């Protein structure tokens, strides 16, 4: 819906995995769709039933299939494609190495991860996030410092990485968004930082900005929703992605 409202033609793909044949057919279909797409979006919302231990692992397993990996590599390196992952999709992009490295690769001990919320349970609320960098095509319609009220709903959203890695992400402009308090200041305090993400990081990008992952559900907002919540709620992510190809 969010992409269609932004002017895109969106195809929803459902992975079928009840049999080995169904998996093989799903892989073949996914490869075909990637080769005929300009944008690949990995959704959240308890994708795959949030199993096993967070559905990002299931999504990542599919994308590590050699045929799909090859299609994604060609999609990013030769066709200037864009990728977006929200919530579970963000988890998958991180587990694949697409974030923050921009390619599907084996992870190292210092690679960033998304782990369990500090409070040890699921959180569902509205939080404020601030645009830190708009080097990504996904954020071309906003400016650094802009603040948006966005929904969160997750159990494993805490961004964690060694401090040296995080500093490098900031230096490269790859930290896209942070959780902030009512004064617009990044914070580690609940409920403003709902999961305890280090440096209040909510979303990051690949080095070239074309792969973007975030925990907050920007796709949930429609006009007339959250009427009792103040603040700007439209991050213009989807229209930015679509406009990139115009």
Residue ranges of predicted features:
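C-terminal and late-domain segments of enzyme folds
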Residues: 4, 126, 131-246
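Short clusters of hydrophobic/aromatic residues that line enzyme substrate/ligand-binding pockets
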Residues: 59, 114, 138, 142
